[in-house]
Amino acid sequence: MTAPERRASAALAAIFALRMLGLFLLLPVFALEAVHYPGGDNPLRVGLALGIYGLTQALLQIPLGMASDRWGRKRIIQAGLALFAIGSLVAAWAPTLEWLTLGRALQGAGAISAAVTALLADLTRDAVRTKAMALVGISIALTFALSLVVAPPLVAAVGLGGLFALTAVLAVLGMWVVARVVPPEPPRLPTAARASLRTVLLDHRLARLNLGVFMLHAVQLALWVALPALLLQAGLEAAKHGWVYLLAVLAAFGVMGALLFRLERRGYLRAVFLGAIGLIALAQLGLWWSASLGAPPLALLALLLFLFFIGFNTLEASQPSLVSRLASASQRGAALGGYNTLQSLGFFVGGVAGGALLALWGIDGLFLACTALTLLWLLLAWGMPALPASAPQRRGAALAATDTKT
C-alpha cells in the first residue's frame, strides 16, 4: 500500500469501528436493560426496538449509496453520522420503549456502509483493495469482541441511556475523522456517465455476491441466538464468553492474514472464496453435533468458533472487494448499496429466523438449518465464473501473453 492508501484505509476503518462500537455495546445488554422501560416486559416490542435498526438500514442503503455517487461520498457519510448521532441522543433521552424504538430507527437511517466502502474503493487500487477491506473487517470484528467484554460493566456504571449517549459522542468523533483525516475523494463522474440502478441490480455476478452476504449474515445472527446457551452448557459462565470470542477472532485473523493475501496475489481467490464458505459449513455442522452431546467440550466449541471466524473474516474482506471490482467507478455507490442492503436484511432475517428455529427445534435444529443454508450457498457459489484478477495479476497475464507472442 502507498502512504495515502494506508491513511485512507486506517481512517475509514476507524469510522466503521467508532460507529459499530456504539452498536455492538448494546447487543449483550439491550434486552436485559429494556425491561426497565414501560412495555419492556413484552419480548415482541423489545425485539422490534432492537431489530428496527436493521430494517431502516436495509431500506436506505441503496438510496444513500446512489446519493454518494451523485453528490459525493464524504458529504453523505457526514450526513449519515449526524443522523446516527441524533438517533442516539433520542434513545438516550427516551422515557418509553416507543421513543427508544424511534431512536433506534433514526440510528439505522444513517446508513453509511455503502458510501464508506465505495470511498475506500475509490481511494485504493485493485491490487490492495482486499487488504484494505480486511483492515475494515478487522476493526469491526475486534470492536465486536471487545464490546462483549466491556459492555456489562459499562452499562452497570452508566445505564442504557449512558450507552446511547456514548454512541452519539462516537458518531461525532467519526465526523471529525471524515473531515480531518480521510484524504480528499477523487472527482465525481458527470451524471451522464453514471449507470442506472437497474443495470446494477440485474448483474448476475453482483447478485450472487449479494445473495452470499445475505446468507453469511443470516447464519451469523442465528449463531449468536444459540451460541451463548451452548457455551453455558459447556460450563463457561456468561461473564467469560467475551474472552472466548476475542481469542477466536484474533487467532482467525492471524490465519487469514497469513494466507488470504498471498493466495489472492497468486490468482487463487476463487478457491479461497469457496473454501471459506466450506469452513463455515463445517463449523455449523460441528456445532450441530456439539449441541446433540448435551454438554459439549469447551475446547471443541472454541475450535469450531475459530474455524467459523476464519471463513467469516475471509468473506467479509473478499466479498465487498469483489463487488467494487465488478462495478465501475460510476456504479460503486449503487452496487455497494445493494450489497449492504442484503447484508442488513441478513441481520434482520437471521435474528428473527434464529429465534423461531430455536423455539421450534432447539439448538441442534437451528445449527442443522444453518448447515443446510450454508451448503446451499456453497452450491450456488460453485457456479461462479472466474473472479476478476487484481491489477498486478492482469499485468502479469499481459506480460506472459507478450512473451508467448515473441
Predicted feature locations:
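Intracellular juxtamembrane helix-capping segments at the cytosolic ends
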Residues: 112-124, 314-327
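Conserved MFS/SLC helix-loop-helix module at the cytosolic interface between two early adjacent transmembrane helices
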Residues: 59-95
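C-terminal transmembrane helical hairpin of 12-TM major facilitator-type secondary transporters
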Residues: 270-319
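Cytoplasmic membrane-interface "Motif A"-like loop-to-helix N-cap segments
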Residues: 70-80, 265-278
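Helix-to-loop junctions at the C-terminal end of transmembrane segments
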Residues: 60-72, 254-269, 358
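Juxtamembrane intracellular "pre-TM" segments in multi-pass secondary transporters
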Residues: 1-6, 182-212
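C-terminal membrane-cytosol helix-exit motif in multi-pass small-molecule transporters
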Residues: 168-187, 380-385
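Cytoplasmic helix-loop-helix junction between adjacent transmembrane helices
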Residues: 103-140
